[in-house]
């Protein structure tokens, strides 16, 4: 992986049931983030394949859009994920990129902004936010697309206790919905 002769992942075979929460734990450099990036199609495995519902990921534009609509990832470092001029535009990008019409996107974005308490800074530049605010926006980026699988890489990093609890409540609610 990236010039290193060691395998980040080897012999991994995993089935996760819908409506469950799973935690992947391990030390730094153990392959957790690499695994997450493979699940979302951001990183392609050197050997083997990634299957979702028994279907291998297709590394074409269409195939990657499909998998990213189904599997959303919130990066460990929000700055690796945020790139739009304003928070509102940032949260709108993914759902519009997946083909939602502007009215549907507006409704969904406004709902997530309210749910995650982003309204006070929705018009600010994403790069000017605090670490906790950036994490909230990164979570909203994915939540607005209603993925079947939502991967949160170190979800509580840089969040205050109030927002850590809010993220946990959202994850619990999504898990209950299946």
Where are these regions (language model features)?
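The feature captures the beta-strand-to-loop junction immediately N-terminal to the Walker
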Residues: 25-27
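Helix-to-loop junction immediately C-terminal to a conserved catalytic motif
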Residues: 40
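Conserved ABC transporter NBD signature motif
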Residues: 48-59, 67
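Conserved ABC ATPase "signature" region
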Residues: 103-121
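Conserved ABC ATPase signature
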Residues: 125-129, 133
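Conserved catalytic motifs of ABC-family nucleotide-binding domains
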Residues: 146
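Catalytic Walker B motif of ABC-type/P-loop ATPase nucleotide-binding domains
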Residues: 150-153
């Amino acid at each position: 992986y990236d010039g290193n002769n060691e395998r980040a992942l080897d012999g991994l075979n995993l089935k996760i049931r819908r409506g469950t929460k799973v935690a992947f734990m391990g030390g730094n450099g153990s392959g957790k983030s690499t695994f997450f990036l493979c699940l979302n199609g951001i990183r392609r495995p050197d050997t083997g394949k990634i299957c979702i519902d028994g279907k291998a990921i297709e590394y074409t534009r269409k195939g990657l859009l499909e998998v990213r609509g189904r599997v959303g990832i919130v990066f460990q470092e929000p700055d690796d994920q945020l790139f739009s001029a304003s928070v509102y535009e940032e949260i709108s990008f993914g759902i519009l990129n997946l083909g939602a019409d502007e009215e549907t996107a507006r409704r969904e974005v406004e709902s997530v902004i309210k749910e995650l308490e982003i309204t006070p800074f929705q018009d600010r530049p994403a790069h000017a936010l605090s670490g906790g605010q950036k994490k909230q926006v990164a979570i909203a980026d994915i939540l607005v697309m209603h993925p079947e699988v939502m991967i949160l890489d170190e979800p509580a990093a840089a969040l205050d206790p109030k927002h850590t609890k809010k993220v946990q409540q959202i994850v619990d609610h999504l898990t209950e919905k299946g």
